[in-house]
Amino acid sequence: MKTIIDNFVDRVIEYGMYNEIDKIYVKNRVLALIGEEGTDRISDENDLKQIKDYLVEIALKNGKIKDLIEEKECLGAELMNFIVPLPSRLNDIFWSSYDISPQEAVEEFYKLSKDSDYIKTSAIAKNIEFRASTKYGELEITINLSKPEKDPKTIAAEKLVKATNYPKCLLCMENEGYQGRINYPARSNHRIIRLKLGDEVWGFQYSPYLYFNEHAIFLNSQHVPMAITSKTFEQLLEIVDILPGYFAGSNSDLPISGGSILSHNHYQGGKHIFPMEKAKFESEFRFKDFEDVNAGIVKWPMSVIRLQSENKNRLLDLATKILNKWREYSDLEVDIIAMTEDVPHHTVTPIARKVDGRYELDIVLRDNHTTEQYPDGVFHPHQDVQHIKKENIGLIEVMGLAILPPRLKPELEEVGKYLLGEDNAIADYHLEWADQLKEKYPRINKEEVNSVVQHEAGQVFARVLEDAGVYKNTPSGHEAFMRFVKSVGIN
């Protein structure tokens, strides 16, 4: 039997970062972090992350850290950093492996990101995930419970921390190996693969809180704002060449219609087939001078033009033409406004794929203008569906995966109780919806109530996406969509 400290050190050495001769050195470096008291307890635990958690508790008892989630996270990341190679070494390993098998190189990097607890697999497992059948196919729903809530002690401690602008944001290269602090996540065990996209250096990493399989983030090595241009399409298509089986997409570059981080240019990708990818063409056509590119409108709640070609450059040129036209295009009949004075309202959310040697680019048209009636955005979730989703509709939602806030776990349970006629604490903003459900399901029972509420939450998400779609799925909406397509030029 081994002591807990020796058990940890042996596991570290198994990962190949250190040799047997380094054993005493590694042990002493760990003791420096956690203190010496309590490390002689016997442990036969095999899971490295579990051993790490025990060591963090020892450090707490030894007064090395305070009883704050953030301090525990910082120390935990520092301990798991023992199994992760230096960035230079990891990049050498990745690209050497890539030369033999790109898929294997990616799988190894993904595994290391999970093994080192950079990807928070235990926290992600808390998420509630379900699917809902809609007229657009099966949509995916996640109630996000993975990110820890701040407790009052943390909030109080944050007020005492001096402001700093290092790293500038969560997507900067400077996060690699960053210790973390009370108001900033621990990144000691974080590594980034460098890759060239055209003439720029970018980083490839995974999201610590995955929303889907192999959820990757690609970030510009420079802290520059989001910008959708011809270069965006070029880089997305390059990523799907570099990483076989991955899609790559970008949030839009304007507020309301984009993601939560507009200050740092980045893309997302991964190995997941989203509901939108499964959606078929509603109508097909050929753009003028691009007869070799398959094109059409996708049967989807948002307004999507899909382009397909084996010729990447032709796809790139046509996508750029569509983007440039959309930037300046207005159609007041359907409340589509490209510009208010000097403020632009039009952009796109692009998604690239490569399937069986053929490139595919989905161009989702976005408009972020507001009115008195819709102060949050004309093409933003409207007031009557904000009880389920009021946040911006970014890339992941666009593709058919709802990321819903933690509040919905208890709130949907209360909706279920309300439908059953039981004592409940239903939130006021769910009442109108719940009454509609009561009318729709007058004889609902306990066995089915949960699946009914989940199914109906999925229908609300479909409506959320319809709200964000600039052209509605009506005859007049389709007619207006075709007016734009014709303005680009079709045969």
From Swiss-Prot:
Compartments it resides in: Cytoplasm
Which pathway, per its entry?
Carbohydrate metabolism; galactose metabolism
Tell me, what is an example of a GO biological process annotation in this record? Answer: galactose metabolic process
Output the Gene Ontology terms for molecular function.
Answer: UDP-glucose:hexose-1-phosphate uridylyltransferase activity
Q: Does the keyword Transferase apply?
A: yes
The alphabetized UniProt keywords are: Carbohydrate metabolism, Cytoplasm, Galactose metabolism, Nucleotidyltransferase, Transferase
The keyword Glycoprotein belongs to this UniProt entry's keyword annotation: no
- Which EC number applies? 2.7.7.12
The cross-references to InterPro entries, in alphabetical order and at most eight, read: GalP_uridyl_Trfase_II, GalP_uridyl_Trfase_II_CS, GalP_Utransf_C, GalP_Utransf_N
From the record, what ranges are coiled-coil? none
Q: Which GO terms describe its cellular component?
A: cytoplasm
Reactions accelerated catalytically: alpha-D-galactose 1-phosphate + UDP-alpha-D-glucose = alpha-D-glucose 1-phosphate + UDP-alpha-D-galactose
Question: What main location does UniProt list?
Answer: cytoplasm
Q: Which family does it belong to?
A: Belongs to the galactose-1-phosphate uridylyltransferase type 2 family.
Stated name of the protein: Galactose-1-phosphate uridylyltransferase 1
Q: Which organism is it from?
A: Streptococcus pneumoniae (strain ATCC BAA-255 / R6)
- What gene makes this protein? galT1
